Amino acid sequence: MKHFLTLRDFSKEEILSLVNHASELKKEPKKLLQDKTLAMIFEKNSTRTRMAFELAITELGGKALFLSSNDLQLSRGEPVKDTARVIGAMVDFVMMRVNKHETLLEFARYSKAPVINALSELYHPTQVLGDLLTIKEWNKMQNGIAKVAFIGDSNNMCNSWLIAAAILGFEFSIAIPKNYKISPEIWEFAMKQALISGAKISLSHDRFEALKDKDVVITDTWVSMGEENEKERKIKEFEGFMIDEKAMSVANKDAILLHCLPAYRGYEVSEEIFEKHADVIFEEARNRLYVVKALLCFLDNQRGRE
């Protein structure tokens, strides 16, 4: 069964097809999943992700079932595989926002319904789909190639974008602090994919080096959920990595800024630059709705072929 746990399980053609279908559904809504049910399991708080998934399945003609960790016997020690067997047999899709990626993998092994990663500590693939739709809409993809820079933490967003860029053949530069590392296994996968796709990928510890000649600039919060007690340390480590006027001046003249939100002005991005690119950033957030619609339809079609 086809799940959506990471973009590395999808081909270039499948990823682009999802983005194109999302664009079509944005222009012309259709009720393609009449009476289908989506279970939404949250171990972490969410604003945009919950709204995108709940609205997506509703507007497609289905219904959503919200389940926090407190609603499930998982919080009392029930094995993940048992919960997966029950929920996966009752619904058509399962969306999960989890603390550990291993929870997703275990759930997917035993679920009879396709499982979607709505965020783990390793990956955030639905966000990247939304980013890709936004890049398409702002005409920042020339001949199928975008020039993208990611500035910030070597986190789930960085990992997901690295994989996407490698599969799609993009020019992609990363800038992270010196004591931060990309997962060796994820980096190796990306390098192998880049050889196939022709992607040009680079890693540095200098934001200006990464930003040079880029059309798309991506950043993310420096302090992720669950890292609040590390805030002071991380702010010191990320000194010099803010996306401000000086940083954006190194990118191409009409470069756009993307941020998955929530944004913390004065840290990863300046107030002035955030507001300058607010139209793009909030359309990026809205685009999550349409890529989720396309993803649900894709998984439903895949399941129908089995």
From Swiss-Prot:
Record-linked InterPro entries: Asp/Orn_carbamoyltranf_P-bd (IPR006132), Asp/Orn_carbamoylTrfase (IPR006130), Asp/Orn_carbamoylTrfase_sf (IPR036901), Asp_carbamoyltransf_Asp/Orn-bd (IPR006131), Orn/put_carbamltrans (IPR002292), OTCase_ArgI (IPR024904)
Annotated residues for binding of carbamoyl phosphate: S46, T47, R48, T49, Q73, R97, H124, P125, T126, Q127, C260, L261, R288
Keywords associated with the record: Amino-acid biosynthesis, Arginine biosynthesis, Cytoplasm, Transferase
Keyword presence, Transferase: yes
Entry binding sites for L-ornithine: N156, D220, S224, M225
Gene Ontology BP term (one): L-arginine biosynthetic process
Cysteines engaged in disulfide bonds, as pairs: none
Catalysed transformations (reactions): carbamoyl phosphate + L-ornithine = L-citrulline + phosphate + H(+)
GO molecular function: amino acid binding; ornithine carbamoyltransferase activity
EC number: 2.1.3.3
Localization in the cell: Cytoplasm
SUPFAM superfamilies: Aspartate/ornithine carbamoyltransferase (SSF53671)
Record bears the keyword Amino-acid biosynthesis: yes
Any single Gene Ontology cellular-component annotation: cytoplasm
Pathway: Amino-acid biosynthesis; L-arginine biosynthesis; L-arginine from L-ornithine and carbamoyl phosphate: step 1/3
Pfam families: OTCace, OTCace_N
Family matches, as HAMAP family: OTCase (MF_01109)
Its job: Reversibly catalyzes the transfer of the carbamoyl group from carbamoyl phosphate (CP) to the N(epsilon) atom of ornithine (ORN) to produce L-citrulline.
The family this protein is said to belong to: Belongs to the aspartate/ornithine carbamoyltransferase superfamily. OTCase family.
Protein name per its UniProtKB record: Ornithine carbamoyltransferase
